[in-house]
Amino acid sequence: MVDLHPTGDHHPETGARLAALLAAFNPELEGGPASVEAIERVHDGEYVARVAALGEESWLDGDTPAGPTTWEAARLAAGCAMRAVEVGGFALVRPPGHPALPDRGMGFGIFGSAAIAARHAQAERGIERVAIVDWDVHHGNGTEAIVRDDESILFVSLHQWPYYPGTGGPDTSDATVLNIPLPAGSGDAAYANAFRSLVEPTLRSFDPELLIVSAGFDAHVDDPLASMAVTAAGFREMAARCTQLCPRVAAVLEGGYNVATLPALVEASLEGFAS
């Protein structure tokens, strides 16, 4: 996945992100590519076939390059996410998944790896209720579009607002979706308060058997793509709270575009998940 799915010299989502993480952590397990059947649990078959057939470098939207090796990279990302829910691990993958809509890619995303993993757990592992907590700085519009009408999956998104992709604003929550829009400049205290007052009671009421974290790190104070102020300690605290709310937790890498800080932020989250 490091060298698959090339995005060009000036795109923020590059293989250098994953290379830095693999060098730092030397993961013990590898996942194989997701099957077409698994991907089509969340994506339209016509869109899946279009990605599989890409024969030259192109763009799925103005932000999302794709080419002949994108199919392999996106299948591996989804397959690693599926493996993570089986073993309670953290899937270090690219490209990100949470912006991808059922019928098209967008926002750097090709396939919704977290949603694919959730449906895999339900179809193949006997899990009934799954929660997805997304702390990437961007609203997880793709994941929401996939699961909004599914009462067996709760989606929670904490994100900068207003900001790309322009969804997930105030008054957009319902029985299966909790959107928590936060203003630019929000840091550890704001996220901790949101967890205490909104995320925790909602998760306790839903009582998930599995919690999947869409772990983006672009809300970090030094990330170049956004304007939030979360620190490593803030990510550690959110991860720890997730483990307190569900006995079975897995995580999938989403955004985070400062290659120099990304390994430390993932490490902080791993410490929280292990606490």
Language model features by range: what are they?
Residues 1-275:
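HDAC/HDAC-like amidohydrolase catalytic core signature
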